[in-house]
Regions:
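Conserved catalytic alpha/beta cores of large enzymes that bind or transform nucleotide phosphates
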Residues: 134
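Phosphodiester-processing cores and adjacent nucleic acid-binding clamps
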Residues: 1-80, 85, 90-103, 110, ...
């Protein structure tokens, strides 16, 4: 701080990772300066933000847990719904807790499959070259879905690809979808990781040919059926109630992935709110690192400047992953 002052900087911001212990020493430097010296210290933190605003059931419309669900999985040429392509869709329909129908097909991506994807999935160019393209397959899959609620493991990824392809083909899409990763966080709190094979093992469900869409979809369906039973035991009968259950569970927040966020105090109110955020991150939501839920940040946002941070920030990661423009716009709007 003193060096920044001596070099002629008008101000310096302190943004240590997750803590504010440096504030006292910085304040001592300010106290040693002349009272008329305009140099300022901006108090802040580089926090670990978690998105607890995402629901277990996105876009729910009051559906009952006894309804019809399409549990699905896709394999793709990469992670970007914008620039990569679907190479396999596997899905099963679940009605009254039972699998009643299946949908399984390769999709011709009209481009070579990257070697790393072939290594992961076992899907080769030869396996998809004679398949129909997504322009033909997608309407068939939409018809298979009908009015059902979609279910997937890490659903935003799979649904994101389907929605992006619907957008390209000008197919109207208004899906309700349930994420079994989010369900696992609240129903299996003893787990530290929530990959499909980890959750399946915890529930004694067999998973063969992992990273093949139809097999992963079948496994996810069995997981979902067990989760529905666990939810009913808690007297949760609608997707709206399931979302409320997830909202009230701080243990699930502790398991969410983190993004870096820059938080600066604009004034004394902001400084108090900053202290409250840091305290909550350590005392309530700590798990390997101090976590700040988005909902808690919104409650204490007065007097704060919130920035999207570095390459580990939510916005940077979304751009790098090629997220759709609507997703990018929503992230920008938060900051």
């Amino acid at each position: 701080v003193k060096r920044a002052h001596d070099w002629g900087h008008p101000a310096i911001a302190i943004t240590d990772h997750g803590v504010v212990q440096g504030f006292t020493d910085a304040n001592h430097v300010i106290e040693d300066l002349d009272k008329d010296d305009p140099f300022k210290v901006i108090y802040g933190v580089e926090g670990y933000l978690v998105d607890d605003l995402t629901k277990i059931a996105e876009n729910e419309k009051g559906q009952d847990l006894e309804g019809t669900y399409v549990v699905f999985d896709i394999e793709t040429t990469g992670f970007s719904a914008v620039t990569d392509r679907i190479i396999e869709i596997g899905a099963v329909k679940v009605e009254d807790g039972k699998i009643t129908d299946k949908f399984s097909t390769f999709v011709n991506p009209k481009r070579p499959i990257p070697f790393r994807i072939t290594e992961l999935t076992g899907i080769t160019d030869e396996m998809v070259i004679g398949s129909l393209d997504i322009e033909t397959i997608l309407p068939q899959f939409i018809e298979f879905i009908g009015d059902a609620v979609l279910v997937a493991h890490n659903a935003s990824f799979d649904v994101g690809f389907i929605e992006q392809n619907c957008k390209r083909q000008k197919i109207e899409a208004d899906f309700t979808y349930v994420d079994t990763v989010a369900l696992a966080r609240v129903l299996l709190p003893a787990l530290n990781r929530f990959k499909l094979d980890t959750v399946a093992k915890a529930l004694n469900i067999s998973l063969e040919n992992h990273h093949r869409a139809v097999d992963d979809a079948g496994c996810t369906a069995e997981i979902f059926v067990k989760f529905v039973q666990m939810l009913k035991e808690r007297e949760l009968t609608t997707l709206a109630k399931v979302n409320e259950f997830g909202d009230l569970n701080p243990d699930s927040i502790k398991k969410l992935p983190t993004y870096h966020v820059i938080i600066l105090a604009r004034n004394d109110i902001g400084r108090v709110n900053l202290y409250q955020l840091v305290s909550a991150s350590h005392l309530v939501y700590y798990n390997r690192r101090p976590r700040i839920p988005k909902s808690v940040l919104n409650e204490h946002r007065e007097g704060l400047i919130v920035g999207s941070a570095c390459e580990a920030g939510e916005l940077y990661r979304a751009l790098l992953d090629g997220k759709p423009d609507e997703t990018i716009a929503a992230i920008v709007d938060f900051y």
